[in-house]
Design a protein with these regions (language model features):
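S-adenosyl-L-methionine-dependent methyltransferase catalytic module, highlighting the catalytic core
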Residues: 4, 12-125
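Conserved SAM-binding site of S-adenosyl-L-methionine-dependent methyltransferases, i.e.
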Residues: 8
Length: 128
């Protein structure tokens, strides 16, 4: 089992990470933030960090995402999340689509937190 808590939303290539995980395990736990335009656009403290929703292709499949910028957080002495200035936040549906495409048929959700201070988040347990 791969345990990826607080990792996916810091990636520049989140689908690639999920694909790599799918090659080494048939079970995965993920806790992650995801992009939801309706929620984030109504949060003044968050919306300035995100570009508009866009799409990209990975292995011929389209996924929706928003680029998130760490902005001033990169200057913090503590951990801000990643060494790069940006990360890719997939939409909730794109995360689920990617897991299904990678063969994870049994997907369970929990700990949905729409009002998390850093943006909407949820946990997933998935197995092939």
């Amino acid at each position: 089992m791969v345990f990826a808590s607080g990792v996916l939303y810091h990636m520049e290539e989140p689908i690639r990470l999920l694909k790599l995980i799918s090659k080494v395990s048939d079970k995965i736990f993920i806790w992650t933030h995801y992009y939801d335009k309706g929620i984030i656009s109504n949060r003044v403290e968050l919306r300035h960090k995100f570009d508009p929703v866009s799409s990209f292709q990975y292995d011929g499949i389209s996924y929706d995402y928003a680029t998130q910028s760490y902005k001033d957080a990169l200057a913090w002495e503590g951990f801000c999340g990643g060494p790069k200035p940006i990360s890719i936040w997939l939409t909730r549906d794109s995360i689920i689509k990617a897991l299904r495409q990678l063969g994870f048929a049994d997907i369970q959700f929990n700990f949905e937190h729409l009002n998390h201070p850093n943006g909407p988040a949820f946990a997933i347990c998935a197995k092939k």
